Amino acid sequence: MPSTLLLDSEGLSKLYLKDRTVLALVQAASEEGTRVATTAMTALEADYERIHPARIRWVLSRIDVHDVTKSVTDQAAALLRSHHLSGPKYAIDAVLAAIARSAPRPVTVLTSDPEDISLLCGPAVEVIKA
């Protein structure tokens, strides 16, 4: 059964930094056939200062990076409107939530902001703290 593990910027940064917990989670997901993914906006948002560009390229080559298309932005905008949210903080979360809501189920999101992501994703998506 296809499933998806989505990483927000904190989860992706921890993967870049070889955090043992996140590495183990991603490896277990991959071994189980779970698709590990993030968004292009999340890749841009993740912490780059302490990470060698080659490490970033290597990590991103091993996970799915979803493009932020007009369709995705329309879905994200609808989520923001329906929850009366706005601004860049919520925009990036809404893009991740739009991808999560349309990804093969079951979907898990690894995030530093479980409250906002849970609100935007709804009950069909499992949210765990990074």
Give, region by region, the residue ranges found by the protein language model.
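Short, well-structured N-terminal submotif of metal-dependent ribonuclease cores
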Residues: 1-38, 48-61
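Acidic, PIN/NYN-like endoribonuclease modules and their adjacent C-terminal/linker elements
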Residues: 2-4, 101-130
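A generic structural signal for short hydrophobic patches within well-formed alpha-helices
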Residues: 12-13, 43-46, 73, 117
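A general structural signal for well-ordered alpha-helical segments in protein cores
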Residues: 22-23, 43, 53-56, 73-76, ...
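Short active-site oxyanion
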Residues: 33-36, 62-64, 103-108
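Acidic, metal-associated active-site segment
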Residues: 46, 89-108
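Acidic catalytic patch
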Residues: 64-85, 94
